[in-house]
From Swiss-Prot:
Name of the protein this chain belongs to: Cytochrome c-type biogenesis protein CcmE
Role, per record: Heme chaperone required for the biogenesis of c-type cytochromes. Transiently binds heme delivered by CcmC and transfers the heme to apo-cytochromes in a process facilitated by CcmF and CcmH.
Organism from which the protein derives: Pectobacterium atrosepticum (strain SCRI 1043 / ATCC BAA-672) (Erwinia carotovora subsp. atroseptica)
TM regions (residue ranges): 9-29
Any single biological process term in GO: cytochrome complex assembly
HAMAP family attached to this UniProt entry: CcmE
Amino acid sequence: MSAPRKTRLYAILAVVCGAVLTIALMLYALSSNIDLFYTPSEILYGKNETQEKPAIGQRLRVGGMVMPGSVRRDSQSLEVRFTVYDAKGSVDVTYNGMLPDLFREGQGVVAQGILDTDDHIAAKEVLARHDENYTPPEIKAAMEGQNGHAPAAGPEGKRL
């Protein structure tokens, strides 16, 4: 092999090795920031046909409904304990902080945190979900007419 071909081969190999190393480092950095989404039943019984359960200590997000009657607040701190459920199971969540305004029993919620035990999540963040018809209380009050009713229809049946 001639000297120019050898130099070109080494340059190509160096570029390929550099690209592989860069991709490997990027994937390693991203893997620590990935939080997989689970439902309570997937945490308890596994995901899909593989029945793969999240590992204890894994960062994840759990989404479901807040079980009515399950919210317990600590009077000495901001700690809140509640249960998130779906059709097939429920998991307990502990969160230390201010809950969102939309957080209510029977309402949808997504908790992001770490799986402590098989059925308990220590949440770092709690997001309240709502449907597309949500109206903030202040706007709803401003839009409603007297006695809590919407304004009457105007000309041609249009709402005022």
